Swiss-Prot record:
Composition bias type Polar residues, residue spans: 494-526, 805-819, 998-1017
Predominant cellular place of this UniProt entry's protein: nucleus
Stretch list, region Disordered: 494-652, 805-833, 970-1017
UniProt source species: Saccharomyces cerevisiae (strain ATCC 204508 / S288c)
Catalytic reactions on record: L-seryl-[protein] + ATP = O-phospho-L-seryl-[protein] + ADP + H(+); L-threonyl-[protein] + ATP = O-phospho-L-threonyl-[protein] + ADP + H(+)
Protein name, per record: Serine/threonine-protein kinase PKH2
Active site annotation, chain numbering: D303
Changes seen on gene knockout: Long-term depletion of PKH2 in a PKH1 null mutant (Pkh depletion) induces programmed cell death. This is mediated by the lack of Pkh-dependent activation of the PKC1 downstream signaling cascade and results in accumulation of reactive oxygen species (ROS) and DNA fragmentation.
Organism domain of life: Eukaryota
Length: 1081
């Protein structure tokens, strides 16, 4: 079919020649009108032929039997009024308001037939295209509900404005041709914001350009219609960006918005890093008041962030980007004062990761309180300069938001800190409402009802600096108004009334009009809430709590734990009682000592029963049942005890003791720090055997020994000298495992006792004074490698590869490449003029770790082995055979049996720099050999956990050995007459030292490190003196210095009598004289 010039349909079909003629005519008309005045109306120009339109659209329109009307390239329904100066003076504000864009036709764009917003609708492309047409405005002038009607004069072809009243107004409509588009000032998810300047008035606007094809393809038409509806609804507010006009062309849709020349709020914070308290108060008040205005008009923004807060020419905030807003339906039929239910939930996942609320992530819903959460995040960012929930990616950010995991920066103002802590709350019912935020002490000098937050001059922008005023705490009683008024009610408690808006011309009207006291209503009404009836379970818990309080009042002398802890302790006591009944063979004393609640490492001070007397007392470790139950832990959890070593296996008795105060039923407090005469039974020593115990029962000593863990890993045995050389070349070190907790000796004492090497055995007292044979530490069985499986028989490589975590191939390549480098070195050494020769070349061209280690002569191979750790402190190393052993009928052959509980055996973790490689190596050190275990990170952590259990379960056994050893050393010392007896070691046979001016701790007498380090040689004297000094500094309380004698009592500069001075020295002239004096005495 063919369309004539008068838009009448012709039955003749459309021919290709017709299309060519129409295109030629179109170009001719375009050239003809290109030189005309730009104010010439677009409707007066000849229209483009409708034969160039989509054929599918034509067929669809034919079915609907609608008259085919040509559509202009630029729609001019929504316009910017352009008055002459004389006409503007004669028009009042109401008349200007009448001809503005505020047409009611746009307000129902996103609504359905029943008038409800935000509902799903058909996403058909044709419906989307019609929706876009409606957003830009209908082409039918007579359908508009404006009071101004536009008609065309056939003679002049210029628009004439006719009003239903007698007054007439000359209005010039503007389209896309009337603006000059400049640079891009913003970019959104599906739009681009450009600077548009009016050609006539030179006034600048922000033109938001949206691609219609993209909107239809990505199903974003709904968001565009919501944004226009929200902007039209809030168009008269100073806190929201104004929408002046909407128009379109064939490819794009245009929103002509208010231009904010000072950019967004995020750029301001990035420029200054942070904002001081005055600026934060000024902008926070405007933001929270703008959010209140949105909620009072039934709009939830749902994407409030600094990027969506603009700054106008007066440095006041403007909210923008309402594409993801939630439009609430009014609950009443009142047009003047509609009410909205803010508790309406939405399940749409919208927002930005750093500002999204936790209820959306945890419970997949959100309501009006998501805007309050975002406000709290922005307030935090104003001071800290970064959002409270920030991570490297969105997933980690969401994890922090879900857990409400954030930390205040140092020097954060205490008043703002209090406000942020009450806003960023996971529980919605405990989160502050807008009315409570406005009543907070932070906004005490502001009045939100008279609009003064918008009329005040903005303060000077300055970054935040800590000062004495910011560190002032919240005044007492200032937050009484913030007592929660329970916002968890539904229905009327969330009904808000629409707040009145001011005139669109903010400059010509006062701010008090916007916030009229008669029409203003707070977002959350303060309504008293009826108490919910308590259920039976809650009533029973409350009754038990009352009974417990009454019992404690009746028994003032007996203190019992309260709250959830008492319930957990009662459960622990019941469990202990049940265990005692199931095993009647054990005595009551042993059962009490075996309880995890009563077992505590010696030296731990008792927790006082009164928290007021010692508020900083450390809490002792709780029982296993308490830890397993969901009970809040105490504010301080003591570190785990470190492994037992020859220097710290024996716990020092503190110089002061406190009287023990028992709790009821269970002993939470640690026992007195004295040596127990009862054998402490380990929790792992259970009489019941498990599956692993039965499998390895041939190698277990008795039924009480149990298998704690089995693992297959790389195993290597080496001497300490070899290991030390390889570690020195790798800059590695052996340290106490981090899982064992804080070591009880300082780094200085480690250096002193190891002769300058932290991990060595040089000058170790255990090796010089009281050495043991190799069999006491481990036993070794010879195995035939030919009988083993291939995995256990084939060597894995050298120890160097194990330390640097290098594969065999890579290591061989390094070995093959090393001769080439040696040749190069020899050639460079022959050149005498070469600058990089000898040591200088080694300095600038260091060799790799594998090359350095491969140059050593010692080769130590590692193999695959299976290790078994038992509750008796045994570390068994097995090799797997191809055929079962004919004697034992087992496929595993025992190679090493290491005693982990033997004094002198240490558990270490080998650490090397990252550039040398990565490994996870456990080292078991003995004075003779070192055993290295290599596995992955997860298994290494589990191994250290089991090793810690083993070491901590043998405290009393080591204490007994130390006492016996001390007694033997004392006997040996007293039998020799020519050997000096240190005064720090008390014994019944040794002469008592002369009285000192300060109290001496008895702890030194029980430590064997000094007694074992005694040597008759004079060369060892300095090491003994330094050892005594280290032990005294670590274990004893602070001693008072001895008084300096008077000069009259000095003989040749020395006192007449022996006076003990620092470092364990006395004033005797030499060691022999002191011993001689002791004989005479």
């Amino acid at each position: 079919m063919y369309f004539d010039k008068d838009n009448s349909m012709s039955p003749r079909p459309l021919l290709p020649s017709d299309e060519q003629k129409l295109n030629i005519n179109l170009l001719t008309k375009k050239e003809k009108f290109s030189h005309l005045d730009p104010h010439y109306d677009a409707k007066a120009t000849p229209q483009r032929s409708t034969s160039n339109r989509n054929v599918g659209d034509l067929l669809l329109e034919k079915r609907t039997a609608k008259p085919m009307i040509q559509k202009a390239l630029t729609n001019t329904d929504n316009f910017i009024e352009m008055y002459h100066n004389q006409q503007r003076k004669n028009l009042d504000d109401d008349t200007i308001k009448e001809v503005m864009i505020n047409d009611e036709n746009g307000k129902t764009v996103a609504s359905t037939n029943d008038g409800r917003y935000d509902n799903d609708y058909d996403n058909n492309d044709i419906n989307d295209q019609k929706t876009l047409d409606n957003i830009a405005g209908s082409p039918h002038m007579e359908k508009n509900r404006n009071k101004v009607k536009i008609e065309h004069d056939s003679s002049s072809q210029k628009p004439i404005a006719k009003e239903s009243s007698k007054a007439q107004k000359n209005i010039i409509k503007k389209g896309i041709k009337d603006f000059k588009f400049g640079s891009v000032i913003g970019d959104g998810a599906y739009s681009t914001v450009m600077l548009a300047t009016s050609i006539d008035t030179k006034k600048r606007y922000a033109a938001k350009v949206l691609n219609k094809e993209y909107l239809i393809r990505q199903k974003k038409v709904k968001y565009v219609s919501i944004e226009k509806t929200a902007l039209q609804k809030l168009n008269n507010s100073p806190s929201v960006v104004r929408l002046f006009s909407t128009f379109q062309d064939e490819s794009s849709l245009y929103f002509l918005l208010e231009y904010a020349p000072n950019g967004d709020f995020l750029s301001l914070m990035k420029k200054y890093g942070s904002l001081d308290e005055t600026c934060a108060r000024y902008y926070a008040a405007q933001i929270i008041d703008a959010i209140d205005y949105l909620h009072s008009n039934g709009i939830i923004h749902r994407d409030i962030k600094p990027e969506n807060i603009l700054l106008d020419g007066e440095m006041k905030i403007k909210l923008t980007d309402f594409g993801t807003a939630k439009l609430l339906n009014p609950t009443n039929n009142s047009v003047s004062k509609p009410e909205y239910d803010l508790s309406t939930r939405s399940k749409s996942f919208v927002g930005t990761a750093e500002y999204v609320s936790p209820e959306l992530l945890n419970d997949s819903f959100t309501d009006y309180r998501c805007d309050i959460w975002a406000f709290g995040c922005i307030l935090f960012q104003m001071i800290a300069g970064k959002p409270p929930f920030k991570a490297t990616n969105e997933y980690l950010t969401f994890q922090k938001v879900m857990k409400v995991q954030y930390a205040f920066t140092p020097g954060f103002p205490l008043i703002i800190r209090d406000l942020v802590k009450k806003i960023l709350v996971k529980n919605l019912d405990r989160r502050l409402t807008i009315s409570q935020i406005k009543e907070h002490h932070f906004f005490k000098d502001l009045n939100f009802k008279d609009g003064s937050v918008w009329s005040k001059t903005p303060p000077e922008i300055k970054p935040y600096k800590i000062n004495a005023k910011s560190m002032q705490a919240m005044p007492s009683g200032s937050d009484r108004k913030l007592v929660k008024k329970s916002v968890n009610t539904l229905g009327k408690s969330h009904l808000v009334t629409q707040r009145s808006a001011s005139s669109p011309s903010v400059e010509e009207t006062t701010h008090s009009t916007l916030y009229n006291n008669n029409t203003h209503a707070s977002t959350e009404s303060e309504i008293s809430i009826k108490k919910r009836p308590t259920d039976e379970r809650t009533a029973q818990i409350l009754e038990n709590a009352r009974k417990g309080i009454n019992n404690r009042k009746n028994q003032p002398g007996k203190r019992t734990p309260s709250g959830a802890a008492s319930a957990a302790l009662a459960a622990s006591a019941a469990l202990t009682k049940k265990t005692m009944q199931s095993y009647p063979t054990s005595s009551s004393k042993s059962s009490r000592s075996s309880s995890p609640a009563t077992t505590s490492r010696p030296g731990t001070y008792k927790r006082t029963s009164s928290t007021e007397s010692k508020p900083f007392a450390k809490s002792p470790p709780l029982s296993a049942s308490v830890l397993s139950s969901k009970v809040p832990m105490p504010p301080y959890t003591p570190p785990m005890s470190p492994p037992m070593t020859p220097y710290d296996t024996y716990q020092m008795t503190p110089p002061y003791t406190t009287k023990q105060q028992d709790y009821s039923d269970t002993a939470i407090a640690a026992p007195k720090p004295c040596i127990s005469k009862q054998n402490v039974k380990n929790s792992t020593d259970s009489p019941l055997m498990n599956k692993q115990d039965i499998q390895w029962s041939f190698y277990l000593k008795n039924i009480n020994e149990h298998v704690l863990r089995t693992e297959k890993l790389d195993f290597v045995t080496t001497n300490y000298d070899i290991l030390e050389k390889k570690m020195l070349k790798l800059n590695g070190s052996l340290l106490d495992p981090q899982l064992f907790g804080k070591p009880r000796h300082t780094f200085l004492s480690q250096v002193a006792r190891s002769g300058g090497e932290v991990t060595g055995f040089r000058n170790d007292p255990t090796m010089t004074a009281y050495s043991k044979t190799e069999d006491t530490y481990y036993s070794k069985n010879i195995i035939d490698l030919q009988l083993l499986e291939d995995d256990y028989r084939i060597e894995g490589g050298d120890l160097s590869e194990l330390l640097t975590n290098r594969s065999g191939e890579g290591y061989k390549c390094n070995q093959n490449s090393s001769p080439m480098k040696d040749d190069d070195k020899s050639e460079s050494n022959n050149k005498g003029s070469s600058v990089f020769s000898g040591k200088i070349k080694k300095l600038f061209h260091p060799t790799s770790a594998a090359e350095t280690l491969s140059s050593s002569d010692e080769k130590t191979k590692y193999y695959k082995r299976t290790i078994v750790m038992t509750s008796f402190g045994r570390f068994l190393v097995f090799a797997k055979r191809r055929q079962p052993n004919p004697v034992t009928n087992l496929k595993y052959e025992l190679e090493y049996d290491i005693n982990l509980r033997q004094q002198g055996t240490k558990i270490k973790e080998l650490i090397i720099p990252l550039e040398m490689g990565t490994n996870h190596i456990v080292v078991i050190q003995t004075p003779y050999k070192s055993f290295l275990l290599s596995t992955d990170k997860k298994t290494t952590s589990k191994l250290f956990t089991v090793l810690k259990k083993i070491l901590n379960s043998n405290t009393n056994k080591i204490e007994k050995e130390l006492l016996q050893r001390n007694q033997k050393v004392i006997e040996r010392r007293t039998s020799s007459s020519g050997r000096a007896i240190p005064k720090d070691l008390p014994t019944s046979k040794s002469p008592s030292p002369k009285p000192r001016t300060h109290s001496q701790s008895p702890s030194i007498s029980k430590h064997n490190s000094f007694s074992e380090s005694i040597n008759s040689a004079k060369s060892n004297r300095s090491s003994r003196i330094f050892e005594t000094f280290i032990n005294a500094k670590e274990q004893n309380s602070k001693k008072h210095a001895a008084p300096v004698p008077l000069t009259s009592k000095l003989v040749n500069g020395l006192p007449k009598r022996q006076v003990t001075v620092g470092l364990g020295l006395n004033t005797g002239t030499n060691f022999k004289n002191s011993s001689a004096k002791s004989k005479r005495s």
